[in-house]
A protein has these predicted regions:
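Active-site neighborhoods and metal-handling regions in enzymes and metal-associated proteins
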Residues: 1-374
Length: 374
């Protein structure tokens, strides 16, 4: 295993409150008048609890939820399908109030019984301090378990945010004003904790190593589709994960054609020597993203105008990095980048595409609408 892969393998799971920016989470609820939240989005659940569910597709209903009250945020509750009890026991996560419910693995042709929960309690799970409470709070459907959790934290009524508002509306909870909590969660996730920064640094290092290995594997005749698979293979070897259809690669330009072209596994044309490539690769480690990469002139070095633009782009990047301070606006940084291009003698800086990659549990850990409706 490489040094990057070894570092990832040795990275311990972090406790609750290390990934989660709790002060901003509470601030977001206060600003939006939320008494509490019911969180079901898998990335948000992971952010709050460290729990990463297994093998669910993105459009499937989630058999879990985190319930958190603004008035007692130190007492979150996890509502979860009974078959995940052993997963939680192995995680030894921070949420110790576990409310299981009878889920799809139990037979539909037999009547539900309180003893059904025992089918999912192995010896390590039985040793958990929270298991007696889980047994006591076992319910036969998710809504019943969720209602019990809401009652326990004083949220039988009030304004409750759901990061999946459709889920909240389908529950038809009496006395509850269901509100959208997507932006509240993104407000918290926007500012990373030190533990998150460490994960993002590791993810970026893994991406760089995978790109360098992929470049070294290029030979004449290799197609974009093959390069995509080569890159994904190196990511896997290094301990990362690439989602279907894979890491994106931008090929730009191709000869005299300056169009931005996304080349992925759907493109089976060869990568020709002399092609200017900008790798823009996506993937995750411990669910945290990397995004971006580096430029490459295939089997060559920048020449002529390309060499001038390469040097100017380095200056632009250095200038913008120095200006990236709290409060700086993306538009201001882009304008500064164009100004730097002009200072470097680039004739038409307005033709430059200056784009900023987002990093976090997603590539857009930002609000779409602020608390004041902007």
């Amino acid at each position: 295993m490489s040094s990057v892969g070894t570092a990832l393998a040795k990275t311990p799971l972090q406790p609750f409150g290390t990934y989660c920016n709790q002060p901003r989470l509470i601030q977001a609820m206060e600003a939006r008048g939320l008494d509490g939240m019911v969180i079901t989005n898998p990335l948000n659940v992971y952010y709050l609890s460290g729990f990463n569910s297994i093998a669910h597709k993105s459009d499937e209903p989630r058999p879990y939820a985190v319930v958190i009250s603004r008035h007692s945020p130190e007492q979150p509750i996890m509502v979860i399908a009974d078959y995940y009890l052993s997963t939680l026991a192995a995680l030894q996560g921070p949420i110790t109030d576990i409310r299981p419910f009878r889920a799809v693995m139990m037979p539909m042709d037999l009547p539900p019984a309180a003893a059904d929960i025992e089918r999912f309690i192995d010896q390590p799970t039985a040793a958990q301090n929270w298991i007696s409470g889980a047994r006591e709070n076992y319910r036969f459907d998710m809504k019943s378990a969720l209602l019990g959790a809401l009652s326990s934290v004083g949220l039988k009524t009030g304004r409750i945010g759901f990061d999946d508002l459709g889920f909240g509306l389908r529950l038809r909870l009496d006395g509850v004003d269901a509100a959208d909590a997507y932006d509240a969660m993104m407000f918290a996730r926007a500012v990373k904790t030190p533990a998150e920064m460490q994960l993002l640094q590791q993810a970026t290092a893994l991406n760089e190593a995978a790109i360098e290995r992929s470049r070294a594997d290029w030979t004449p005749g290799i197609t974009w589709r093959e390069m995509d698979r080569i890159y994904a293979g190196h990511v896997n070897d290094l301990g990362g994960f690439v989602r279907d259809p894979g890491g994106m690669v931008w090929g730009h330009p191709r000869g005299a054609d300056s169009a931005l072209v996304l080349s992925t596994s759907n493109d089976n044309t060869p990568i020709e020597a002399g092609t200017h490539v900008m790798f823009d690769c996506h993937g995750t480690t411990a669910l945290y993203c990397w995004d971006g990469g580096k430029t490459w002139v295939v089997d060559d070095e920048p020449q002529g105008l390309a060499k001038q633009l390469d040097g100017a782009t380095q200056r632009v990047a250095e200038t913008m990095l120095a200006a990236m301070k709290p409060g700086a606006r993306i538009s201001e940084l882009q304008a500064l980048g164009r100004q730097t291009y002009r200072q470097c003698g680039v004739a038409d800086g307005d033709q430059a595409i200056i784009f900023f990659h987002g990093l976090g549990l997603s590539h857009m850990d930002i609000e779409t609408t602020t608390a004041d409706g902007q």
